[in-house]
């Protein structure tokens, strides 16, 4: 089991990072919060979780133990796999998830991509009391420090690819991203576009 990595960041995208350890590059999926703490060419340390499936072995990277713990707890709910858990964590902080579960705040949970009313209700019931170690704090890193590209086409493709990876259709993702880029003329921050697209597309699902 690979539980952490320490090495140089040799590549980074909108939803992944590659860390070289001992001459081997490990590709890890991560949320914007974790990616915001990493810089290409610099040394890094991340906590990891290895998810093994029949068709793939996937590493997920986290900058805090709270993030990794939340990732594991979310998957205890029937119907919530690693991809959906990361989708939830891409728009909600661990403390916000814990608070929403304890208070039965279904609407907050529904902000996450792929989480409808029924699943949100199941999460609130099944996970209640499972977050005792998470404090309701707001001092964690926020999305917005990911390296940007100055080309709208490249930015759009990058965000659309991330949305498709989270379960949205390419057509819906492309339409949403295009509209956001038109409204936010001149933006070069893919993470802010991704967050806005997630909120809009999740709202459409509800």
From Swiss-Prot:
Region feature Flexible linker, mapped onto this chain: 143-150
Description of its domains: Has three domains with a flexible linker between the domains II and III and assumes an 'L' shape. Domain III is highly mobile and contacts RuvB.
Top-level lineage group: Bacteria
Region (Domain I): 1-63
Family, per entry: Belongs to the RuvA family.
Matches recorded under NCBIfam families: ruvA
Subunit structure: Homotetramer. Forms an RuvA(8)-RuvB(12)-Holliday junction (HJ) complex. HJ DNA is sandwiched between 2 RuvA tetramers; dsDNA enters through RuvA and exits via RuvB. An RuvB hexamer assembles on each DNA strand where it exits the tetramer. Each RuvB hexamer is contacted by two RuvA subunits (via domain III) on 2 adjacent RuvB subunits; this complex drives branch migration. In the full resolvosome a probable DNA-RuvA(4)-RuvB(12)-RuvC(2) complex forms which resolves the HJ.
Protein name: Holliday junction branch migration complex subunit RuvA
One GO MF term: ATP binding
Organism: Corynebacterium urealyticum (strain ATCC 43042 / DSM 7109)
Pfam families documented for this protein: HHH_5, RuvA_C, RuvA_N
């Amino acid at each position: 089991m690979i539980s952490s990595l320490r090495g140089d960041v040799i590549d980074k995208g909108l939803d992944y990072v590659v860390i070289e350890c001992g001459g081997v590059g490990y590709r890890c999926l991560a949320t914007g919060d974790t990616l915001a703490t990493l810089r290409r060419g610099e040394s890094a340390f991340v906590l990891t979780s290895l998810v093994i499936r029949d068709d793939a072995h996937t590493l997920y990277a986290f900058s805090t133990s709270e993030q990794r713990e939340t990732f594991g707890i979310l998957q205890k709910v029937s119907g919530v796999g690693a991809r959906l858990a990361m989708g939830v964590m891409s728009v909600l902080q661990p403390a916000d998830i814990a608070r929403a579960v304890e208070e039965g705040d279904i609407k907050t949970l529904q902000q996450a991509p792929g989480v409808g009313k029924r699943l949100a209700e199941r999460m609130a019931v099944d996970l209640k009391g499972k977050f005792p170690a998470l404090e309701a704090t707001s001092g964690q890193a926020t999305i917005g420090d990911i390296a940007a590209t100055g080309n709208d086409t490249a930015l759009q493709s990058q965000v659309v690819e991330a949305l498709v990876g989270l379960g949205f259709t390419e057509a819906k993702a492309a339409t949403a991203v295009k509209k956001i880029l038109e409204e936010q003329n001149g933006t070069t921050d893919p993470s802010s576009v991704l967050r806005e697209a997630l909120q809009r597309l999740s709202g459409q699902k509800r």
